[in-house]
Design a protein with these regions (language model features):
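Class I S-adenosyl-L-methionine
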Residues: 1-65
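Catalytic phosphate/metal-binding cores of nucleic-acid and nucleotide-processing enzymes, i.e., regions
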Residues: 13, 89-92
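Conserved Class I SAM-dependent methyltransferase catalytic core
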Residues: 16, 107-168, 173
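Conserved acidic residues
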Residues: 26, 88, 157
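S-adenosyl-L-methionine
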Residues: 60-82
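A short acidic, Gly/Pro-enriched loop at the edge of an enzyme's catalytic core
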Residues: 80-90
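A short SAM/SAH-binding and catalytic strip from SAM-dependent methyltransferases
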Residues: 91-100
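Glycine/threonine-rich flexible loop motifs
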Residues: 100-106
Length: 174
């Protein structure tokens, strides 16, 4: 699985969107939407929801779900989205360590690049809900370094650790 495309389990997707307390008027972006597991909850609230997915098969599924996805590499989402898309909330479950096949190496830095680009697009004062592997947590050196780097742009208010077994039935474990 070159791009590390593992769908977010529905219960985890629901929890993330619930905790963000989405409101009428919010503009939502899911920059690496995959099967739309996160975006469907925002869309169910009738919020303006934008999806992006690089994989053509998953984009087709997003279209079936009623989205009009763009097809950019989420690592560069801020560079390519039209200026009118200025989300008040970003929901994401980026690849934890995959480069999308561009290099032979995997590193959590690739997933962090997705996060940085989405953060750059987030409206000032907006909300950001993200699912990361353990390497993205504050208690890992890599994660701590990353969050310190972006701390001027975002305030971490809550971290929930989820047992990797929640992902087994979706084809992966963290």
């Amino acid at each position: 699985i070159i791009r590390q495309q593992f769908s977010t389990p529905p219960a985890i997707a629901y929890l993330l969107t619930y905790l963000l307390n989405l409101k009428s008027g919010d503009q939502i972006l899911e920059p690496s939407a995959g099967t739309g597991s996160l975006a469907v909850w925002a869309n169910g609230l009738h919020l303006e929801t934008y999806t992006n997915e690089i994989d053509s098969r998953r984009r087709k599924l997003l279209e079936v779900l009623g989205f009009n996805p763009t097809a950019y590499d989420a690592e560069f989402i801020n560079d390519f989205l039209p200026p009118a898309i200025s989300p008040t909330c970003v929901l994401m479950n980026p690849p934890f360590s995959s480069s999308g096949g561009r290099t032979k190496n995997n590193s959590s830095k690739f997933g962090f690049r997705h996060v940085e680009s989405a953060l750059a697009r987030l409206k000032k004062g907006g909300k950001f809900g993200i699912i990361l592997s353990e390497a993205g947590g504050l208690d890992s050196k890599t994660g701590n370094d990353f969050w310190r780097k972006v701390s001027d742009r975002i305030e971490v208010k809550l971290i929930i650790k989820i047992d990797g077994r929640e992902y087994y039935k979706n084809g992966s474990a963290t």
